[in-house]
Amino acid sequence: MQLPSFLEVYEGLISTSSISSTDPSWDQGNAKVIEKLASWFKDLGFSVEVIEVEPGKHNMIARMGEGEGGLLLAGHSDTVPFDEGRWSFDPHKLTEKDNRFYGLGTADMKGFFAFIYEAVKKIDWSKQTKPLYVLATCDEETTMLGARHFTENAPFKPDYCIIGEPTSLVPIRGHKGHVANAIRVTGKSGHSSDPALGVNAIEIMHEVMFAMMQLRDKLVKEYHHPGFAIPSPTLNLGHIHGGDSANRICGCCELHYDVRPLPGISLDGLENMLRGALKEVEAKWPGRLEIIPLHDPIPGYECQHDHPFIGGVEEICQTSSETVNYCTEAPFLQQLCPTLVLGPGSIDQAHQPDEFLSFDFIDPTIDVLSRAMVKYCC
């Protein structure tokens, strides 16, 4: 049987739409792309299991080899939506131009599975001593559903994991988490000619925002990690809306904010700090404040700095590991084994019109993955 080429696999991935979104009109599921991945890896000799996590949402686990431990290569199979008017190319067609692959998912990150596929074909597997696993997850771009489900129900425990997000082939050993909430203040509307007729939600929100800015200062003062370019947690007040007319007492005001906690800050601890910051406002205005999560919180992540896995991958890549401020599935997979984030392409291309991957990454990525497979499986 003739196996598909690297280019054919890449084209097949990009042409198979797998958008995930919190907007139901965009959300598609990933069944079709998982079906293709399962078929390709079966043809390579992997045993493959497809798990339906939710209707239309699937994970794929492929395994080559027997025994314990081994290496897990992981990534998400979904993409973000796209703004067609801002693209110069068809997002669902792999376009080659100016030594680049253009298309939705070329860098972030369906294309990574084509690199795994090609690297596997170059290995002499007769010398294999430990298993190689490939994990393709669902809904990374929205809820991290696939990674959460896999971690909670993992059928094996690898020695190490590499997640192929676009890092320009620089190993990433840590990143901040992400917590995003809405604070809704419910007042009582009324005619502005008599303030006593109502309770102004904007005025209460003013007190909330003062408390949140005090919390921001506390986070900066109490937490510091020298391994990050921005060494403290960040708290951003990102969106606010309240009221509907200048001559009405505002009956409702809502503030959206996010926090990017450092590794080591527990989500429960952060929640307690938030509640503590708002305690006085809530006591003054009982029943008028509500905190609503905008998505499931993601903790910070860090692979132990002196772990041999970091040194081994740094040697393969011939570059030092770093930390970043964006989020991946690493906090969940790190619960199973030491995990690094390492993949082709630049994070600057993620979620952008005319997303692309430079041809300069093709041979080095296949080489890095091949060497990792040999080092940790053979």
UniProtKB/Swiss-Prot annotation:
Compartments, record wording: Cytoplasm
Cofactor: Zn(2+); Co(2+); glutathione
Keyword Hydrolase: yes
UniProt cross-references to InterPro entries, sorted A to Z: AcOrn-deacetyl, ArgE/DapE_CS, Bact_exopeptidase_dim_dom, Peptidase_M20, Peptidase_M20_dimer, Peptidase_M20A
Protein family: Belongs to the peptidase M20A family. ArgE subfamily.
PANTHER family given in the database record: ACETYLORNITHINE DEACETYLASE (PTHR43808:SF1)
Pathway annotation: Amino-acid biosynthesis; L-arginine biosynthesis; L-ornithine from N(2)-acetyl-L-ornithine (linear): step 1/1
Function, in words: Catalyzes the hydrolysis of the amide bond of N(2)-acetylated L-amino acids. Cleaves the acetyl group from N-acetyl-L-ornithine to form L-ornithine, an intermediate in L-arginine biosynthesis pathway, and a branchpoint in the synthesis of polyamines.
Binding residues for Zn(2+) 1: 76, 108, 165
Enzyme Commission identifier(s): 3.5.1.16
Catalytic reaction list: N(2)-acetyl-L-ornithine + H2O = L-ornithine + acetate
Protein's name in the database: Acetylornithine deacetylase
Enzyme class name: hydrolase
Entry's cofactor comment: Binds 2 Zn(2+) or Co(2+) ions per subunit.
Pfam families documented for this protein: M20_dimer (PF07687), Peptidase_M20 (PF01546)
Keyword Mitochondrion: no
Keywords: Amino-acid biosynthesis, Arginine biosynthesis, Cobalt, Cytoplasm, Hydrolase, Metal-binding, Zinc
Quaternary structure and partners: Homodimer.
Catalytic machinery residues: 78, 140
Residue intervals passing through the bilayer: none
Cellular component, GO, one term: cytoplasm
Protein's GO biological process: L-arginine biosynthetic process
